[in-house]
Amino acid sequence: MLQMIPARPSRALASLSEAYEECRQITARYAKTFYLGTLLMPEAKRQAIWAIYVWCRRTDELVDGPQAAQTNFATLDAWERRLERLFAGEPEDDCDVALVDTLARYPLDIQPFRDMIEGQRMDLLQNRYSTFEDLYTYCYRVAGTVGLMSQPVMGIESTNSRAPWDPTTPPDPTQEALALGIANQLTNILRDVGEDARRGRIYLPQEELAQFNYSEQDLFNGVIDDRWRAFMQFQLDRARDYFEQAERGIRQLSHDARWPVWASLMLYREILDVIEQNNYDVFRKRAYVPTWRKLCSLPVAMLRATVL
């Protein structure tokens, strides 16, 4: 469990190396697949990504962690004020020290951070989403923002400019970074359907459930039939479309960021394959990618990062 909003420190804060080490340990503990991808980055970039991840996780745990019952709008308002102090260079605990250093090293914009907090406010307000457009807004705020936060750290390859006579439109790195975050969150949602349902939450578009004639009660009962399989296949296909869009932007990244981003994308997308292999049973089976498959993906990711 991570500490959320402690009082201002009465002791000396950690050194910079200690702060980044704490962020590394938290990332390794809570995000094993993601952490594996960060190890492929240069040291400075992976440390910055760890610091960003820890802030995002702490933000998420405000409404989704062990102390979530104590969180209200005032809690999130206080967290946003603390964010403003971080951007002003005022850390309040050890993990903050790492993020403040990251903010000094890279041109991060505060708006994606604010938007993520707004996503947590959405979680306090609602536990259903009528349309995919509504769900997309939520996905942007809680996950698409991560891509926007990370992009300045990853860097854009300046040599990717095209010849003036090339009629094709180059990918927009910002949109591709956003697409990867959306794809990851849609994957999380599909993997965690059963877990969320047990908490009374449904992150699946109500309109689309109705189109497949699948009711909330069916979902709470964990019914797996042709309706559910067709519905889930539709959702999986859409998530894969976002991963495909994200692929087009990877070649725009700096060379030293392409391998880890390819690895992260491939490893996360494999969760969708596992859901299919589990016959779409996300109620009783946890879709996870075995370690051996993760390791097998790394050389493929390296090849794609080099060739594409």
Curated annotation (Swiss-Prot):
Cofactor(s), names only, from the UniProt record: ATP; Mn(2+); Mg(2+)
Record CDD domains: Trans_IPPS_HH
EC numbers, comma separated: 2.5.1.32
One of the GO biological process terms: carotenoid biosynthetic process
Alphabetical keyword list: Carotenoid biosynthesis, Magnesium, Manganese, Metal-binding, Transferase
Cofactor note: ATP is required for the transferase activity but it does not seem to be hydrolyzed during the reaction.
Membrane-spanning ranges: none
Chemical reaction(s) catalysed: 2 (2E,6E,10E)-geranylgeranyl diphosphate = 15-cis-phytoene + 2 diphosphate
InterPro entries per the UniProt record, alphabetical: Isoprenoid_synthase_dom_sf, PhytoSynCyanob, Squ/phyt_synthse, Squalene/phytoene_synthase_CS, Trans_IPPS_bact-type, Trans_IPPS_HH
Gene Ontology MF terms: 15-cis-phytoene synthase activity; geranylgeranyl diphosphate synthase activity; metal ion binding; squalene synthase [NAD(P)H] activity
Domain of life: Bacteria
Cited function: Involved in the biosynthesis of carotenoids. Catalyzes the condensation of two molecules of geranylgeranyl diphosphate (GGPP) to give prephytoene diphosphate (PPPP) and the subsequent rearrangement of the cyclopropylcarbinyl intermediate to yield 15-cis-phytoene.
Family designation: Belongs to the phytoene/squalene synthase family.
Protein name per its UniProtKB record: 15-cis-phytoene synthase
